A protein has these predicted regions:
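Nucleotidyl polymerases of mobile genetic elements and RNA viruses
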Residues: 1-165, 169
Length: 169
């Protein structure tokens, strides 16, 4: 086990260490897959998310899949992988661009590092809902904003929540 004291003196940290028999750690750290930091989350701590998506792609035989099958994998697997992190923290736009480039290359070409000029539809059009002529792929930037706005909505409409007094991102 480990304990991470926040705004505690060294005496309190050593008391925690001796009383709980746990290692005392410090920030930044990873908790439930989320990189936690006292300051803004550095891009380097979000690179494991990009690696996780790349490992997922490596297991699929993309050359054997039709474009429709790749679209289904993009919509239901690849776009869903970063949702847990998007709900809690603001991801650096450079990391989001890397993820969206990986998704785009997989969708259109079935491989990584494809030429962007050979895409059949622009990315903003692709991210539109099906009812509006798009393919229903999530725009990760807008998804992150909407997920974090959900916390603000719950804070405004339900003051009985235990985290109501906390400052939200």
């Amino acid at each position: 086990c480990s304990a991470t004291p926040i705004r505690c003196d060294e005496e309190v940290a050593s008391t925690i260490d001796s009383t709980l028999a746990c290692a005392v750690t410090s920030f930044p750290l990873v908790y439930l897959g989320l990189p936690l930091s006292v300051r803004k989350t550095p891009s380097s701590s979000l690179l494991p998310l990009v690696d996780k998506i790349m490992r997922k792609l490596a297991t699929w035989k993309a050359a054997l899949l039709t474009r429709g099958e790749r679209l289904a994998l993009v919509r239901h697997v690849l776009s869903a992988m970063p949702v847990h992190i998007l709900m809690a923290i603001v991801i650096n736009p450079s990391i989001l661009k890397k993820i969206m480039r990986i998704i785009r290359d997989f969708l259109w070409h079935g491989r990584r590092n494809a030429r962007s000029g050979s895409c059949l539809v622009s990315w903003p059009r692709l991210c539109r809902p099906i009812e509006f002529g798009g393919l229903g792929v999530r725009d990760l930037y807008l998804t992150g904003i909407s997920l974090r706005c959900r916390w603000l909505w719950l804070k405004a409409t339900d003051p009985a929540r235990p985290w109501h007094h906390l400052q939200l991102p």
